[in-house]
Structures are given as C-alpha cells and as structure tokens.
Amino acid sequence: MNRIDFKFKELKDQGKKALIPFITAGDPSLDTTVNIVLEMDKKGADIVEIGIPYSDPLADGPIIQGSSQRAIKGGAKIRNIMETVRKIRGKSEIPLVYMVYYSSIFKYGLERFIAEASAVGINGIIIPDLPIEERGDIMDITVKYEVHLIPLVAPTSKRRIQEIAAGGSGFVYCVSKNGVTGVGEKIKTDIKEYMELVGSYTELPKALGFGISGSSMAREFKPYCDGIIIGSAIIDIIYKCKGEKEILDKVGNFISEVKKSLE
C-alpha cells in the first residue's frame, strides 16, 4: 500500500485529520531541507509536500515565489533534490509528495522524473499546471511506478471540478480560493459546500490548502475535509529565522500547535 493511502486510512480509523506542510526544497539549503522535514515528522506532520523550485511559479504568491528564487540561487536542481529526498527517506517513513510544475518535468523527461522520484521514496506528485489532455499519459507512468498523481481542484465550475477530481489518486488537493497561494487574504469560498461538492465526485480524501495561516483556521475547516495543507505560513517562518537551529525550533513549534488543533 502506498504510504499516502496507509496514512489517510490510519488517521480515519483514529478520527483525526492530516496535517500536510509544504516547504521549498533548497530554501535555505538542501541540507537544512532534510532536517526541516525530519523535525516536522517528529512534531506531528502526517505528509510533507516538497516544492521543486521554479522560476515562474504561476500558482504561487510572493512568499513561495521568493522561496523558489532563493532555492534556485542556492543551486537547487531536480537532480540534487532527488538526492535530498533519498536522505530524508533513509531516516523517515513519512509520506512525501513533490509539488512540481509541468514544464520542469517535461524538460527533465516525464518517465525519467517519475521513475527517479519513485526510486528515492516519493509517494505522490502534484502538478498544478498540468493540462487535462496530458493527464492520461502521465497517469500511465505514475501507475507504473506506484506514485500517486494527486489532482488539484479549485472552486470553479462543477463540470471542471468533476473532470479533475474524477481523475487522479492519493488525495484531492482542494484549493480554498481562486488566485495564488499566500496568507492574509480572507477565504470567501463556502468551504462546507465546496468540500461536499468535491466529495460527490470522488471517494479520495480531500485536503484543503491555499491561505490557511495556522491553528485557528485549521480548526475552523477541519470538520469539512480530511487534511489541511499549510505552505506560505511555514515558508515565512523559515525566511524570518536566523540559522538552522531557530528554523527547526520555530517550525517544529508551529507544526505541534497546528497538529493539536486537528486532533
């Protein structure tokens, strides 16, 4: 069983919700990325999303864009990110998911990317800009290598939600609002209604992300979904810290606090 499937089943049996933090690989460094993931695992994260930095991340707001730019400037590339994941997997069984833009993996080679991701211990892939017409070809490869292709839906038309949610595996990444990632802007979507709509088209677990800033919002939305995804708030903590020790302390405390709100 894929680690993602096992984790959601385990949490469902316990009546708990998944905490899914996002970080950018290589911000502030690849070595620190390893230690951040291990610390988040220790403090209660259930699944970790690892963003592969991209020069023009259309779905991301300024916080994650800045993180991508810092990681690229620091030398983070797909090849050395794969090695970073291998190091994490050598010390942890936590489910790991890549968030990666389509053009990055297209240039690298679709099958090469997915085969290498599977080999180093990645359990799922989210491609925010994946054209629907390309999904079938990629899904054939992800199935071959036992990696989930996680669909990403937004509060748009019912037909579009149905089309996207019906294809994919692992869980559905439910974007809480139209636009880009980031905290500070009020979520205007009726989350209960939106989650019920997505749930009417798929039996996959539903994880809610974009704009969730911490434990109070996680607590507010947890009745309607199976997991909460938090990215920009964590990236912002990392950016404001001086040195790895402070990063690990503050990110670890944040994860502990949010995890408590989901229990």
Swiss-Prot record:
Pathway connected to this protein: Amino-acid biosynthesis; L-tryptophan biosynthesis; L-tryptophan from chorismate: step 5/5
SUPFAM superfamilies in UniProt: Ribulose-phoshate binding barrel
Active site: E49 (proton acceptor), D60 (proton acceptor)
InterPro entries, sorted: Aldolase_TIM, RibuloseP-bd_barrel, Trp_synthase_alpha_AS, Trp_synthase_suA
Signal sequence, renumbered to the chain: none
EC number(s) from the headed UniProt entry: 4.2.1.20
Keywords: Amino-acid biosynthesis, Aromatic amino acid biosynthesis, Lyase, Tryptophan biosynthesis
Annotated GO CC locations: cytosol
A Gene Ontology molecular function term of the record: tryptophan synthase activity
Reaction(s) this enzyme catalyzes, per UniProt: (1S,2R)-1-C-(indol-3-yl)glycerol 3-phosphate + L-serine = D-glyceraldehyde 3-phosphate + L-tryptophan + H2O
Subunit: Tetramer of two alpha and two beta chains.
Function: The alpha subunit is responsible for the aldol cleavage of indoleglycerol phosphate to indole and glyceraldehyde 3-phosphate.
Family: Belongs to the TrpA family.
HAMAP family: Trp_synth_alpha
Name recorded for this polypeptide: Tryptophan synthase alpha chain
Organism: Clostridium kluyveri (strain ATCC 8527 / DSM 555 / NBRC 12016 / NCIMB 10680 / K1)
